[in-house]
Amino acid sequence: MSHLNIANLGEDFVAQWLQSTGWMILNRQFSCRWGEIDIIAQHTRNNQESILAFVEVKTRSPGNWDDGGRGAITLKKQAKIERTARIFLAKYPDKAEYICRFDVAIVSYQIISKQDHELSITQESVTSSSVGEYKFQLQEYIPAAFECLID
């Protein structure tokens, strides 16, 4: 399976996890000339205050070289995500008053054997999922992972 397909499966997994925790997915792979945001999600608190999360998903196999994807969230990448978020808010001005934050989801995946796949179905939790021959696990979800400069 290609890197792009693995990345998309990782994003699918995180979107499902967010929905299971009360978030509504507003957009997936929102892109403009500045970059792309993997997931844009909204959560409304009990007091009706809405949070808008711009989520960067990093899906990595064991033994990767960039600390599970954390090393790929450079200042340059953060600036691209922020510029893309500004474009999203300009396109959807009704969301501009929401509390905005930039989250990062670290997902690991591995190829599983048929025997392991059968076991994972019965032991699966909300933070792990199997798709075909791959098992995905949410290693870490970092809310407000980097500074939000959106007004």
Swiss-Prot record:
GO terms for molecular function: nucleic acid binding. This is UPF0102 protein Ava_4800. Belongs to the UPF0102 family. NCBIfam families: YraN family protein. The lineage of its organism: Bacteria, Bacillati, Cyanobacteriota, Cyanophyceae, Nostocales. It comes from Trichormus variabilis (strain ATCC 29413 / PCC 7937). It holds the Pfam family UPF0102. PANTHER family: UPF0102 PROTEIN YRAN.
